[in-house]
Curated annotation (Swiss-Prot):
Assigned GO CC terms: plasma membrane
Family the UniProt entry places it in: Belongs to the Casparian strip membrane proteins (CASP) family.
Species, as recorded: Oryza sativa subsp. indica
Stretches assigned to the Extracellular side: 29-52, 105-135
Transmembrane feature ranges: 8-28, 53-73, 84-104, 136-156
Name listed for the protein in its UniProt record: CASP-like protein 1C1-1
Assembly with partners or alone: Homodimer and heterodimers.
Side Cytoplasmic, residues: 1-7, 74-83, 157-162
Key words of the record: Cell membrane, Membrane, Transmembrane, Transmembrane helix
Recorded topology in the membrane: Multi-pass membrane protein
Principal location class: membrane
Location(s) in or outside the cell: Cell membrane
Length: 162
């Protein structure tokens, strides 16, 4: 259907877009911090204080780096190498999904709290932090969409038989 060069270009564009979105998500989350005075006490909110947000940064940074490193591999690799790359991409996609889910759950707690557990919402006090986390989650969602498009395209173009 498409020439080998056209397939390669589409794969590279999808991979670079996914890597870029992952890098943006990681940087936005890493920049998430805010300080306010509440009842005379200084309160800080930083992504480092929540393990799931740290996981989100690490996962997106790893996906971004791995996606760019893969571009250095010659496109004329063996079918076995292509299949191994596909398996690695699937694993990284699952890590991305887990990181987004964990960070999203923490963002929900930050926004609405949990009345059953007695946890108060913090976004009223530290809106800048919550806005940056929300922006990082949007970028993380875009990363997953792009990454899964890349995966589907890789599966579609991978030869079925040895």
């Amino acid at each position: 259907m498409f020439s080998a060069k056209a397939r390669w270009i589409v794969a590279v564009v999808l991979r670079v877009a996914a890597a870029g979105a992952a890098a943006v998500a990681a940087v936005l989350m890493a920049m998430s911090h805010d300080e306010v005075i509440v009842y005379g006490m200084e309160v800080q909110a930083k992504f480092r204080y929540t393990p799931s947000l740290v996981f989100f940064v690490a996962a997106n940074a790893a996906v971004s780096a791995c996606s760019l490193v893969v571009l250095l591999v010659p496109s004329s690799t063996s079918k076995l190498a292509a299949r191994l790359l596909l398996m690695a991409d699937v694993v990284l996609g699952m890590v991305l999904a887990g990181a987004l889910a964990a960070a999203g759950a923490m963002a929900e707690l930050g926004k609405n709290g949990n009345s059953h557990a007695g946890w108060i919402a913090i976004c009223v006090q530290v809106p800048l932090f919550c806005d940056r986390v929300r922006s990082a989650l949007v970028a993380g969602s875009a990363t997953i969409v792009l990454y899964y498009l890349m995966l589907m395209y890789s599966i579609y173009t991978l030869p079925m038989f040895p």
